[in-house]
């Protein structure tokens, strides 16, 4: 072990030793030694160690060196076990002869030694050869009392010893033995002179740890053993290396023999025995064994120099030295044979020498051997003593130098303290002046700031009230608008429901009228068949009337058609003006026209189209109302919160003000009471003094005239007695005066001394207290100024950061909203452009289709005009053929009721022939409207039902007239003319193909054939033509562009029109015959009455038609009203949007105002910084303080903590004020005590004066008889002396009173300063509270802005969701409308064909 490690373990042992030294003297008694051994883990060695150190004297004390020697001796005796060899031979410990000690001191013996017996020389020689053999391989480990044992004992307390590599733990010099001593020594059950072998020790360890029962250890059990012996920090790799090193046979287990060989393979069994001397360890073992009987001795030099160790000059701290160093040390002293001396002392010249063992060996040699060795030992001791003497001298010099340095340092410190005191006093005076100046400046500025803040607060509240009134007006207006909109919506809903009911009723009336018309037609046909004769020529006279009626109806129809076209155009314009969500999703404007005649689901869909509009508007209005309600609630909550806060602040301010006023009033009242008491006491004392003065004057003046009179009266008679009494009285008076004077002087001196001491103590305490309070107030004020400046800087920085964050957040929100709005606008624009393009495309296609249809219709019209002109030319000729035709009873072609022609047959009579001829005529008349599709583009689907109602009564009239047999008809048929009625549908079908126009024409022809009623006049023809035109107009919007006639069909159309014109001519001829027949039948009144009735019914039906038209007009007007209401709702919506924009502008305005307020707050906060800069320019000392404040301002402290600190400081100042008040109360009490004492003194003085007065009076009475004038003069002199003493006492009393008044003035000044400081602190606290409230308000405003932004975002999301829902609904409605259009297009032909 090197020097550093040894010094380290010695220092650690000394630290443990010092920790047990409770007295601090450097000596330990028995209890402290027991505690030290417990800390070192030496419970088993404790009795032996106590016996070695203390002996029988349990009250003795030992120092560190003695403990170290005994400690090493105990450990070396515990480790001095001789292992046995293989043959079982062991060396026996020699017994020593007891030598009596040379000196005994108590329980300690000095000069004792042991002489062990010599062992077997052969055994010793063999043992020495073994040691030399093993020493050639490894250096031997010595069982000496070195500091290795200290290292082993401290290994459990220090973790560093466990961090060494494993090989060093087992191979380092001295390490294994000390480790084995520690482990095996502490685990033994008892401490006895006879020890076990290493095998038994290892087995004992395994048994205590509960491992190795099978005689082998695995890796985990080896780790447990290593931890138990102090190797706690072995890593896994090191443990594996140790296990592989111990496992020599490689079976994966460590046996007991392998473990023992690995642990003790490097340990020498023992050291060789010398023929002349025994090793020191054996000496110490014998000493351990013989310590109980007190028969052993030690060296006298060693005992005198306790803890002495030789060769300290060559000791590096480890307790070992090289033999060369020892030999050279001896050579320096003149001893040349040092190597032989070492060998003779059984020390090897090739290894390090244990200096302690060498010391003991030399000590033993000094006692036993004379000669050169003794000289060498003495030289060593002399060298050691000289070395230590040099060290002591060096230490003394260092101590003296340190003492001089300390004195110099103390002088410098005193000088520095004086300078610092002067500097501090100057600084205090300067800071007091500056603080007063600053207080005045701050008071003025604080008053100005307070007035400005009050004005700003009033302005803020005025603005808030105005804004609140404006917002309340806006809310009221919005509520009124909301109620009006809601009322309008309810009215619109009611109107829609009423219109739906009216339309349903009209549809029911139409169905009833249709049924009535059919019934009337059947009745009329029956009547005409039965009663109308062909000879009644009266009907022919009514031809002109019927033509006029037809013309009137045609004009009315045209007017209605024009009116319907105009209404249709207006409806189309309205649809274009409506938003896309309210428009019809169909591609053509005729989608809704096909819904009214259907009367079913289409009718309900058309009527309820305005319901989504009203619901959407109502939802929007509800949302607006909720938003305004929320805004109003938020505004009310804000106003209420601010009002409550202001009220609380006012109440707190009033409360604090009242408390302060009450406190000040109490203090003033207490001071006034004290002042009144002092004044009363002063008045009383003055009165007492005046009374005393008067008494003294009276006593001095009254006896003057008496002595003369008495002297003259009694001089002669009582001269002898007067002299004797005078002497006695004089003596007695002198004694009494002396006694009274002494007592009064003693009392006065005591009182005065006590009062002076008390006064001095009070003055000193007050001055100290005043100085402390002044220093504290100055420090608190400066600290407060620093804190306020730092707080202002922090608040300014935080406010700037907060404003930047808010502005950045607002910018981000604004950018997001702008992006969302731009996206929304772009999307709306795209959808609008797409919709516009679609509508333009559809309208373009419709216009193209209409143009093509108009061309076709123009061609048809041209052909129709030619046919009509030919018909007009043929009319006279046909009329001329009438008589001839009536006379020809030829066969006719029969027409079946289903429209098919049959073969000519013989008719049984003229009546039947005529009856069969009229259905054919009716069929030919019904087929006539086919060539008149010129007005298809003008018809609208809304007037279809009206035209049907108008058309069916006319058809009834037409069908009722030609049922009477007519001669003209028979004449026509008799000429062999065959009616080509069934040819028209067959011609129309190939010409038009699968178009809807062919289907309508065919359905009209079939309907005319099924009726089997002959047409009687031209009015029926016109009505039939109108019916077909209405059907064609109704079917025109459903015709797609692909169904327009192509060029091939255009070539077929002229041929078809020519044939149809021929048929029309034939029908006209037949109608003329019918008219003549009706004119001839005019003679029959019954038939006329029937015709009159039919005409009246026709008029009634016309009036019904007019009513229906009026109802339609009213419905159109109602629709117009609804459209206006919708426009009003639009305007309201725009107004609401404008209101939202106004609210947003108001919020922006509020934000601007808040930023202005923040700027104003920053400006107000910047003013103190400006003041600080001004103070920096004016005052140099305050500039240093401000720099410190700016440096301290970098620290971040919360405002609430600062306010709390200020409150705590205010409480502390209040406590100090209370303490001052208590001190003042104590002073007043002491003053009262002094006054009471003074009063008692005055009373005693008055008693003495009264007694003195009585004595004087007696003396005067006696002197009136005996005392002469000289005696009176002496008494007067005594009275003057007393008066001087009384005046002196009054002067002292006046001085005391003045001092008391000065103290009271000082107390009042201190209280005034404290009030000023409290006022300043309260103002600072109020300012900080206001600033905190402003910060909270700004935070609340920011939070409200965030909430408003969130609401706006939610509103935008809701509108987007609603728009998506509306688009989805529009898509669904478009699909439904397409499906309904398809369904109607399929159902319409079937319904018309029925």
Swiss-Prot record:
Compositional bias (Basic and acidic residues): 151-166, 939-951
Region (Disordered) spans which residues?
77-99, 126-166, 578-602, 866-977
UniProt-listed InterPro entries: EF-hand-dom_pair, EF_Hand_1_Ca_BS, EF_hand_dom
**Polar residues bias: start-end ranges:** 866-893
Q: Which keywords belong to this entry?
A: Calcium, Coiled coil, Cytoplasm, Cytoskeleton, Metal-binding, Microtubule, Phosphoprotein, Repeat, Ubl conjugation
Q: Which residues form the signal peptide?
A: none
Fetch the PROSITE patterns from UniProt.
Answer: EF_HAND_1, EF_HAND_2
Where is the short sequence motif D-box located? 632-640
Residues with the modification Phosphoserine, per the entry, are 149
One protein family per Pfam: EF-hand_7
Question: Which SMART domains does this one have?
Answer: EFh
Q: How would you describe the post-translational modification of this protein?
A: Phosphorylated by PLK1 which disrupts its centrosome association and interaction with gamma-tubulin.
Which stretch carries the motif KEN box?
Answer: 494-496
Q: Which SUPFAM superfamilies match?
A: EF-hand
Tell me, what is one Gene Ontology molecular-function annotation carried by this entry? calcium ion binding
UniProt-listed Gene3D superfamilies: EF-hand (1.10.238.10)
Residues that, per the record, bind Ca(2+): 247, 249, 251, 253, 258
Q: Does the keyword Repeat apply?
A: yes
Q: Which residues form a coiled coil?
A: 382-423, 461-515, 544-584, 835-863, 1057-1229, 1269-1331
Q: How does this polypeptide assemble, per the annotation?
A: Interacts with gamma-tubulin and TUBGCP4. Interacts with anaphase promoting complex/cyclosome (APC/C). Interacts with CDC20 and FZR1. Interacts with LCA5 and USH2A.
Biological role = Involved in the microtubule organization in interphase cells. Overexpression induces the fragmentation of the Golgi, and causes lysosomes to disperse toward the cell periphery; it also interferes with mitotic spindle assembly. Involved in vesicle transport in photoreceptor cells.
Listed PANTHER family: NINEIN, NINEIN-LIKE PROTEIN
- What does the UniProt entry state concerning the protein's domains? The KEN and D (destructive) boxes are required for the cell cycle-controlled NINL degradation by the APC/C pathway.
Q: What is this protein called?
A: Ninein-like protein
Please give the organism. Mus musculus (Mouse)
* Gene that this polypeptide is encoded by: Ninl
